[in-house]
Amino acid sequence: MVVETIERSCEGSKRRHVNGGDIAVPCSGEECSNGDINVAPGVSAKRARVSREMTFEDIYGADALLNDDDDEDDDCDWEPVQAPMEFVKWCCVNCTMSNPGDMVHCCICGEHKESGILRHGYLASPFFKDTGLIEVEEKYGGSSSATSSTAVGFDERMLLHSEFEVKAQPHPERPDRLRAIAASLATAGVFPGRCLPINAREITKQELQMVHTSEHVDAVDTTSQLLYSYFTSDTYANEYSARAARLAAGLCADLATDIFTGRVKNGFALVRPPGHHAGVRHAMGFCLHNNAAVAALVAQAAGAKKVLIVDWDVHHGNGTQEIFEQNKSVLYISLHRHEGGNFYPGTGAADEVGSNGGEGYCVNVPWSCGGVGDKDYIFAFQHVVLPIASAFSPDFVIISAGFDAARGDPLGCCDVTPAGYSRMTQMLGDLCGGKMLVILEGGYNLRSISASATAVIKVLLGENPENELPIATTPSVAGLQTVLDVLNIQLEFWPSLAISYSKLLSELEARLIENKKNQMKRKVVRVPTWWKWGRKKLLYNFLSARMISRSK
């Protein structure tokens, strides 16, 4: 792998943290002076006289009058009424979008410019400046002891992985993602508190080579010797990135072992950089090492014969699919925005089912448009994910939990809520006795990812998800069509889907007929042509009569 390196002097390159915004250069006294127009009394009287005596006919011959010697002197004394002002720009801590300095709330997501989201997560008010919010800490916080067997993997050294260059708009995959989730969990008393922490370790090169080539592992390690580098235009690394990636993979590996061997019931890997785009020999899409793939193979080394990976990140996990597309012992199911290959990374069509004996063990649910929400996801779970997963009968379940399909995410532009994520987690919890590892992938709206991650962990702790979503859901027409396309392809490998496919096909036909009828009802009723011409003739006769009467 070739690492693209950019040399740059260290001098003057340190970041300054000013609420994620640009630092404005203050205007000098001369630039910001509020100059008035100083005019001599005689000149003022002359201008007033010219103003009174000027007519439209005089305009064309007034050049000499307006450009005499006295007025040339006036031009020397002229100053602008007000000098141009430079506005300080600030970037929203929640969604990274830039805003004018005179605005208090983000014009995109409405977050306060001094929001307390990094201290309290989604529990902080988006509309007010952070003032401590002691009442929030008292309501949700506490010193509850860890009474469950849900483990959380987290290490602060992963926060050191960040983009070195100071840019006008922050990179969406930034350390604040983990800070916001950790703040939500701490304020709610979930972690630390009700969850078990596990010690972090750096994964070994031998473990990584179960997934990646030695050249790829060496390329990532090389970045620790560089001030900053890029694998692709959007996949950065600094001197701490390689260690952060090893810590993330090591936490996922140890959580997988502890869950499968029964030391803990389930777990959540609060890690970065994400991993599902990282393939056998390449890093891309913000990802360096494939954490989910490492966890799956470590679980198999611990005794799991069959592993299920469900990837609900809004982007297709092309790296995970590449690693396991020929492996019948790992079933990979991905639900992602696709749009016919026009949405990043462009892979993950429904007909990508695996190869070389692994056909049927790659299941892609590619949404054809943005805006997909809870109903479509849960519908796909009911008719695709759970039937195939039940037939596969896994020993261990991994969720590649990207929260960029969440409502308000700047990259995903979909509409899944925390209630939707918690419901999907609960639906998968009935498989293999609840042996489940949830691994953080994407998600770039801090308020959305912190609320969604907290909702998922509460389900792992045994809490019931919010009852806002009905068990039986009606998908959008686009969602129903996508599910039918997937079922039609996967029928060859999972015959038990035949009954569901026939039923849904009839439902789609009924929906299309109903939509056609509604469109016909909404058509505008057109008036007869003779009536329109009759009105015109009546108006013509009326106006003609009035004109004739006036001319007499």
Swiss-Prot record:
Cofactor, how bound (note): Binds 1 zinc ion per subunit.
Asked if the keyword Ion transport belongs to this entry, the reply reads no
Q: Which Gene3D superfamilies match?
A: Histone deacetylase domain (3.40.800.20)
Record annotation: effect of changing residue 282 to A: No effect on enzymatic activity
Q: Does the keyword Translocase apply?
A: no
- Residue spans annotated as Zn fingers (RanBP2-type) read 86-115
* E.C. numbers: 3.5.1.98
Q: Where is the active site?
A: 277
Q: Which reaction does it catalyse?
A: N(6)-acetyl-L-lysyl-[histone] + H2O = L-lysyl-[histone] + acetate
Family membership noted in the UniProt record: Belongs to the histone deacetylase family. HD type 2 subfamily.
Name of the protein this chain belongs to = Histone deacetylase 15
Q: Which organism is it from?
A: Arabidopsis thaliana (Mouse-ear cress)
Source organism lineage? Eukaryota, Viridiplantae, Streptophyta, Embryophyta, Tracheophyta
